[in-house]
């Protein structure tokens, strides 16, 4: 499923001057993962350890022409064919785009959360259901603020069922993941001590995880936990 540069700019409310309106299908956050430069849009994520803006010129030289940025790189004048979509927060913009993409599909979506076992349960469900449905699922343990948008972006016209993990490590994170995954079926594996250091109590963590399930038609949980 493709979006044009101008469509994405509108969805994420970016400020931009578009050189060429491209057809885009790949979200890129890691310059080392580049495979289809012409179809990629690079989100220059800024973290405590790294700044994606450092890799824009390298990616431009490899054929990428579409970039979501917080600020224009110093070498911008050396990239005359680049489409720079400027936003306040590149991660929030990617999450906004993924949430929009999710809303284009009216299919069962299973959101899986819990302190342990999310990936195992997701893979078990895939094994059980893959003969009956065309399934999209989170790659490996893509359950973070960055991983969930990349997972949801895989949904396409052939998808009949989606399985997505949602992991949190501190309060106020799950509401963003819920907006992106927007599950119709919620599954909680358990509530344990994992990532407890980010929460004042187990009850606080439990309530935060329940945020994922607020719009679900069906919730599955272990009655013994």
Model-derived features with residue positions:
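Phosphate-binding loop of NTP-binding sites
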Residues: 92-224
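N-terminal leader/targeting and accessory segments in enzymes
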Residues: 1-96
